[in-house]
Amino acid sequence: MRLALLLLAILVATELVVSGKNPILQCMGNRGFCRSSCKKSEQAYFYCRTFQMCCLQSYVRISLTGVDDNTNWSYEKHWPRIP
């Protein structure tokens, strides 16, 4: 009986250790995932802190120039003017 309890305790303890996953690191403001290789539907843009690629979905657009697109949303329209 003791042997069965000991085996059960070892089995449960090893299952908890083996089943634990590493948390997936996110990058680009939670738009991408840090992986060693990107999936077919993803593109690598730069590297994460873990020296893995930051993989983004193909539909995610990033402005590399830092210039905002020409939209109606602007800083002047967002904040009220102070007289």
Swiss-Prot record:
GO terms for biological process: defense response to Gram-negative bacterium; defense response to Gram-positive bacterium. Keywords: Antibiotic, Antimicrobial, Defensin, Disulfide bond, Secreted, Signal. Its main location: secreted. It comes from the Eukaryota. Residues 1-19 form the signal peptide. It holds the Pfam family Defensin_big. The keyword Signal applies. Disulfide bonds join C27-C54, C34-C48, C38-C55. It is found in: Secreted. GO terms for cellular component: extracellular region. InterPro entries: Defensin_big_dom (IPR028060). Belongs to the beta-defensin family. This is Beta-defensin 19. It comes from Mus musculus.
